[in-house]
Amino acid sequence: MNSSNLENLNYKSSIRDEVVPSRKRLTLPPWLEVAKPRLIPLLLATTLGGMALTEEWPLSSPKLICTLGGGALAAAAAGALNCLWEMELDKRMTRTSKRALPAGKLSSQTVFLAAVSCTLAASMLLVSGVNYLAAGLTLLGLFSYVILYTVILKPRTTKNIVFGGVAGAIPPLVGASAATGHVGLSGWWLFGLVMLWTPAHFWALAILLKDDYASVGIPMLPSVKGSVFTAKAISRYGWATVLMSIMGVFALPEGGLLYGIMLLPFNGRLLQLINELKKSPDDLSRAKSLFRWSILYMFGICLLLLISRTQLSVEFEQQSMQIFLSIVSLLSN
């Protein structure tokens, strides 16, 4: 290997380490690592977003705690079952070989029992403290992640995250059903937004890890089609995400105007990063920037939904309407 190739390899490795810092900078206890706790906050954020889209927001504290607690337990169970299924795969990848299960820090039996316990606890919490629909949707999300995505789609098709993304899109439905006992059109809007956002978000990471996936035969889009093709696909899904996000103006029971205004910089930055990656698809630093911003983007959307349901938003809309009517009156005279 010549010096230029070695430098390029080291550069790629350093970028990957920066994007997935947990492997280098933060060591979790084995029992916590298998639960994949870094994925849980965003799932809970979109659950809150689903709640905020209903007339019943805000929920009572007991129902809110039961919904989020049940969701966190189910997500932990899904993460553990995913680790169990992919244990042999993780052993073959340098990046994942030191994880708790492939490294022998935990036994398969222990992890399986923990996953079952978390699933049962989540079900009991949601059934007793929320409702059957929220419990059923939560279990559907768990099943979708473990069976549909991990077992069926991930090892077989480059469209794995397109269809497998349904697992990550279910929490908004859980939130809406927890609040009202049914999903409603607004809940389905946020479900659709997460579905469109997921491929662009995940493929940005997959560009950085395409060599890792290729080494074990996982057909992630960048590994099979290359970075140029993937960047174009990211652009399509990114634009679809932006257009869908604007529909939140109409999905909100109130506060849509403030949401729409605050949304502009989020969408602008997302499109900017997507365009930069499209210009230089093999630039790992650009893929890293897009991946990181896409996480902040979805957190931001959920935060905007919550802000839009506050008294501040109501007052803003009232004042805006008064200003608008005053302008119309002046123009008509």
UniProtKB/Swiss-Prot annotation:
It holds the Pfam family UbiA. Belongs to the UbiA prenyltransferase family. Protoheme IX farnesyltransferase subfamily. It is a multi-pass membrane protein. Pathway: Porphyrin-containing compound metabolism; heme O biosynthesis; heme O from protoheme: step 1/1. Its EC number is 2.5.1.141. It catalyses: heme b + (2E,6E)-farnesyl diphosphate + H2O = Fe(II)-heme o + diphosphate. Keywords: Cell inner membrane, Cell membrane, Heme biosynthesis, Membrane, Transferase, Transmembrane, Transmembrane helix. Converts heme B (protoheme IX) to heme O by substitution of the vinyl group on carbon 2 of heme B porphyrin ring with a hydroxyethyl farnesyl side group. The lineage of its organism: Bacteria, Bacillati, Cyanobacteriota, Cyanophyceae, Synechococcales. The gene is ctaB. It comes from the Bacteria. This is Protoheme IX farnesyltransferase. It is found in: Cell inner membrane. GO terms for biological process: heme O biosynthetic process.
